[in-house]
Amino acid sequence: MSSHPTKITFFEFLTPLITAGKKTITIRDESESHYVPNTEVEVFTLETDRKVCDIKILSVAPLKFDDINEFHAEQEAIELPKLKELIREIYPNINELYVIEYELIK
């Protein structure tokens, strides 16, 4: 039986977008790409490790930085320039990323 991640962290300022169902993807690097579709994951704040909600992983797919577009920005509930800036701050020299799609468990 293979283990899979059961916890994911987000910056605190993003968590209201998740609980409102507006943010439905996250873009991560390879080290955080091991989530498994159809599994439930607990969401915590990065800063304070406070549990926020539960999500169900829908898909995990490779994504190059240059391919991040308006569609991803909509799913992230953030403007495209700000999204790309945030990704670059977190992953300064990484172009091989992963998009993790999820849904809020109510």
Swiss-Prot record:
Molecular function terms, GO-annotated: hydrolase activity, acting on carbon-nitrogen (but not peptide) bonds, in linear amidines; N4-acetylcytidine amidohydrolase activity
EC number(s) given by UniProt: 3.5.1.135
List of catalytic residues: 23 (proton acceptor), 26 (nucleophile), 76 (proton donor)
Keywords: Hydrolase
Domain ASCH residues, every copy: 9-105
Keyword Glycoprotein: no
Disulphide bridges: none
A Gene Ontology cellular-component term: cytosol
Catalytic activity field: N(4)-acetylcytidine + H2O = cytidine + acetate + H(+); N(4)-acetyl-2'-deoxycytidine + H2O = 2'-deoxycytidine + acetate + H(+); N(4)-acetylcytosine + H2O = cytosine + acetate + H(+)
InterPro entries, per the entry: AC4CH, ASCH_domain, PUA-like_sf
Gene3D superfamilies named in the record: Hypothetical protein (2.30.130.30)
Hydrolase listed as a keyword: yes
Assigned protein family: Belongs to the N(4)-acetylcytidine amidohydrolase family.
Role of this protein: Catalyzes the hydrolysis of N(4)-acetylcytidine (ac4C).
Annotated protein name in UniProt: N(4)-acetylcytidine amidohydrolase
Species for this entry: Vibrio campbellii (strain ATCC BAA-1116)
